[in-house]
Amino acid sequence: MKKIFIIGTDTEVGKTYISTKLIEACEHENIKSLCLKPVASGQSQFSELCEDVENILNAYKNKFTADEVNLISFSEAVAPHIVAAKSKVDISIENLKQFIEDKYTRRDLDILFIEGAGGLLTPYSNHATQFDLIKALRIPVILVSAIKVGCINHTLLTINELNRHNIKLAGWIANCNDSNIKYINEQINTIEEISGYTCSAKISQNADYLDFIDLSKILISPEENE
């Protein structure tokens, strides 16, 4: 079984959009997947669930429950450590790691996706960040970058930090969902040349799950090291 942690260069860069399309591609190809969202914030307009959790469940056509994919959720769409302190909730790396391991050890899966909250160094508390969880799990990362002004710096900084701690970058996805952005290809090419990592997928505004089928197959291939 392959395990992939999905992070963004920032919040609102399309992580959940990418996650749901990967889920749909896996379902279409009969690839057994589970996508976890251990920490979520921001309540949906349509239910009591957090919006990201709701979208993941919808992508699976509700064959999983919220408790099966999410451990900690907050209705306010703010940084997790802020609302956690306000709510007196402890976001423990050990508890998150245990939640994740419990989920995949009980299932026969081809791939486990773990969708993060925001960027690599999103704080869980004043003493721990999301990166601490990734390092504890020691699993590869898929990085989602929304192509816009500033994305080159954000993407390169994230890749450099992953490399510095010997965390494998399984791939990075260019989310090109804003048709008003100029020089999209030039920005992608710059990231590729400076980082040394080829863009795994360039996703347009009208992409659907079919655009993710090849990527989903690559992610579970034996050639990809965990």
From Swiss-Prot:
Active site: 37
Cofactor(s) annotated in UniProt: Mg(2+)
EC number(s) stated in the UniProt entry for this protein: 6.3.3.3
Binding site for ATP: 12-17, 52, 115-118, 175-176
Locations listed in the record: Cytoplasm
Top-rank EC class of the record's enzyme: ligase
UniProt keyword ATP-binding, yes or no: yes
One of the GO biological process terms: biotin biosynthetic process
First and last residue of the signal peptide: none
Chain positions recorded as Mg(2+) binding sites: 16, 52, 115
Keyword Metal-binding: yes
Major localization listed first in the record, in broad terms: cytoplasm
InterPro entries per the UniProt record, alphabetical: DTB_synth_BioD, P-loop_NTPase
Gene Ontology MF annotations: ATP binding; dethiobiotin synthase activity; magnesium ion binding
Residues that hold substrate according to the record: 41
Functional pathway: Cofactor biosynthesis; biotin biosynthesis; biotin from 7,8-diaminononanoate: step 1/2
Catalyzed reactions per annotation: (7R,8S)-7,8-diammoniononanoate + CO2 + ATP = (4R,5S)-dethiobiotin + ADP + phosphate + 3 H(+)
Keywords attached to this entry: ATP-binding, Biotin biosynthesis, Cytoplasm, Ligase, Magnesium, Metal-binding, Nucleotide-binding
GO cellular component terms, A-Z: cytosol
Function comment: Catalyzes a mechanistically unusual reaction, the ATP-dependent insertion of CO2 between the N7 and N8 nitrogen atoms of 7,8-diaminopelargonic acid (DAPA, also called 7,8-diammoniononanoate) to form a ureido ring.
Subunit architecture: Homodimer.
Family: Belongs to the dethiobiotin synthetase family.
NCBIfam families: bioD
Protein known as: ATP-dependent dethiobiotin synthetase BioD
